[in-house]
Amino acid sequence: SYEQYFGPGTRLTVT
């Protein structure tokens, strides 16, 4: 899994 940050307050977590 990983986390990808697109900007302040915006986060995508993929297992």
From Swiss-Prot:
Subcellular location: Cell membrane
Principal location class: membrane
GO CC annotations on file: T cell receptor complex
Swiss-Prot/TrEMBL keywords: Adaptive immunity, Cell membrane, Immunity, Membrane, Receptor, T cell receptor
Record GO biological process: adaptive immune response
Keyword Kinase: no
Function: J region of the variable domain of T cell receptor (TR) beta chain that participates in the antigen recognition. Alpha-beta T cell receptors are antigen specific receptors which are essential to the immune response and are present on the cell surface of T lymphocytes. Recognize peptide-major histocompatibility (MH) (pMH) complexes that are displayed by antigen presenting cells (APC), a prerequisite for efficient T cell adaptive immunity against pathogens.
Complex formation: Alpha-beta TR is a heterodimer composed of an alpha and beta chain; disulfide-linked. The alpha-beta TR is associated with the transmembrane signaling CD3 coreceptor proteins to form the TR-CD3 (TcR or TCR). The assembly of alpha-beta TR heterodimers with CD3 occurs in the endoplasmic reticulum where a single alpha-beta TR heterodimer associates with one CD3D-CD3E heterodimer, one CD3G-CD3E heterodimer and one CD247 homodimer forming a stable octameric structure. CD3D-CD3E and CD3G-CD3E heterodimers preferentially associate with TR alpha and TR beta chains, respectively.
Protein name: T cell receptor beta joining 2-7
Organism of origin: Homo sapiens
Gene: TRBJ2-7
